[in-house]
UniProtKB/Swiss-Prot annotation:
Taxonomic lineage of the native organism: Bacteria, Pseudomonadati, Pseudomonadota, Alphaproteobacteria, Hyphomicrobiales
The EC number(s) this enzyme carries: 4.2.3.4
Cellular component terms per the entry's GO annotation: cytoplasm
Note on how the cofactor is bound: Binds 1 divalent metal cation per subunit. Can use either Co(2+) or Zn(2+).
Pathway assignment: Metabolic intermediate biosynthesis; chorismate biosynthesis; chorismate from D-erythrose 4-phosphate and phosphoenolpyruvate: step 2/7
CDD domains: DHQS
Record's protein name: 3-dehydroquinate synthase
Amino acid sequence: MSADQPVTVEVGLGDRAYDILIGSGLLSRAGEEISRRLPGTRAAVVTDENVAAAHLDTLKAGLEKGGIQPTVITMPPGEKTKSFAHLEEVVDGILAARLERGDVVIALGGGVIGDLTGFSAGIVRRGMNFVQVPTSLLAQVDSSVGGKTGINSPRGKNLVGVFLQPKLVLADTEVLDTLPIREFRAGYAELAKYGLIDRPELFAWLEANWQKVFAGGPERAQAIAEACRAKADVVARDEFETGDRALLNLGHTFGHALEAATQYDGARLVHGEGVAIGMALAHRFSSRLNLASPDDAARVETHLRAVGLPWRMADIPGELPDAEALLAFITQDKKVSRGALTFILTRGIGQAFIAKDVPASEVLSFLRENHPTSRKAG
């Protein structure tokens, strides 16, 4: 795949439709691609210290080629940046640059920067133009697509935010070459998720080709494009998560609870790792409820283990709160409706479904059985 021929995936949302461009060298073309869609705009780039060191100069040069001289707002890296304090800092930076409603706010970074920047763009001047330039695999296949933005609260993950669709997503596959292997693995969990939801052929392809995806080349771009198509299809059907879009939360109810339980400490657990454990638990829980075969849960666990991802609570360093405390985090999750527990469960690989009114007693028993302190865990 050359810089001249990126793959284009359209997110079909009527007059708010936008393109995801996937290919090599897109940072150098950012100004051209943005100016074509948003002529005459000024810009602020929000990034973090690590991404800035690796990619900011390339993006700035690409923007300047398109006539855009950006203001740069740099944040510390890590999940704890998704906070009210850092939201205020980004908002103030945008206002200090005297950007107007028709100007553009660009997120250069992973999921944290994308979520924080999108929320900022959504509330400054009651909504500004927003462009995603995701630099992690997780952001390229998941968080940069679909318009969810937000920050964390001490009471839970992503509880404060808005929907704001970007005008454009530029997924430059070159930037993934600088990604630490742990971060790449974390993003891979979200990629595999699409196969587990409703594309069993994708999961089977990943089982056979995951090493090529990790190595780079055409298989990596192919996998990213397939994941983006899967998410774009769901978002076009259900933009505001009133129905099918909830399927994209496979693994996230357990995963978010584990992230909250570790106080969003990235040294212990990053988001994609939480999703990996959550997906394994969702399949195991489905098996426990006699909804799916234990063989499917074992297949998911085997694949996660093969790529080097955690797949059980015992893989998280340090002590976890007890099962009752984990259940309390789950009940705080957004996927709770009027106190009833809602989970994304499965009838098999690629057969995820929304399960409402899941008994809390069943969840608690399952958490006790799978807690690292239980002899049954593992």
